[in-house]
Amino acid sequence: MQYGTFVISLDFELLWGVRDKRTVADYGANIRGVRDVVPALLDLFAERDIACTWATVGLLFAGTEEAMVAALPARKPDYANPRISSYHYLAEVGADEERDPYYYGLSLIRRILGYPAQEIGTHTFSHFYCLEEGGSTDAFRADLEAARVAAAHLGVSLASIVFPRNQISPVHLAVSREFGLRAFRGNEQTWFHRARRDREQNLLVRGCRLADSYLPLAGAHDREPALVGGLVDVPASRFLRPVSRNAALERLRLWRITSAMETAARRRRLFHLWWHPHNFGVDLQENLAFLRKILDHFRILQDRYGMRSMTMAAVADEVLNAHGQSGTAHQ
């Protein structure tokens, strides 16, 4: 890469992304808070000229229950554990977005589309789990078709995919390519970040990931995008955790991120920051203040090294063009 690149991707999912583990009772405040998070992030990104990929669950494109039901794929996953399926919770969904802020996102998607340098990608239609037992290839293909159609209703042509729970496999990359997807967010290379089933997410794995937010267990996290199975891997560098009350840990967390960004800018490589809007759903102002510090450092790196802010699709198109293949995104 000629210059270092800063990528932000957001897993935009509302309750669909956590319903197998959380409820409205214990996590509803975070989900409701997304109604304020999305406009606040968009304004901040516009103010700082920051590009972002919003990897959006396809079910969020519906504005009413009727529209949601009409958009469902005929073939659905038959998970061994039915509680991980979004379709298991359809009976909970309210009549429309005004009455149900947990499962609908149409107005927020429209708002995103009104801002510059913001890409709508896919987080699959149903928050599909590619590595869980019962998530067949045919069901995944039907899921992506439903996501494609839902996005097309708003004039969106999907170019990027973020796999739910980062469950990636070569087979699912091949199916993604069938639908014209060009970019995916690959996992970090260390063992505790590799793709795995939910039951394999043990305390050791989770503990190492948490510790890596503060200590350099997995190195600098600067990578180069690469062609993998015909798609461009725009690899993850760092999950942006919500703020904590421990000021010393927060300083360490900020240093961990900004030092890795500095390394990427200096080496002309990529730094990819990601999180979920609902991570900012409570303590919004504190989380925005932390993000502003990151963006302040990006501006320094932009001036010093020419570091760029790009969407996943734009990175993919640059890589594909370098390999003599065409791309169409320009963010």
Spans of features found by a protein language model:
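Catalytic alpha-helical scaffold of carbohydrate-active enzymes acting on polysaccharides/glycoconjugates
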Residues: 1-160, 165-232, 250-273, 280-331
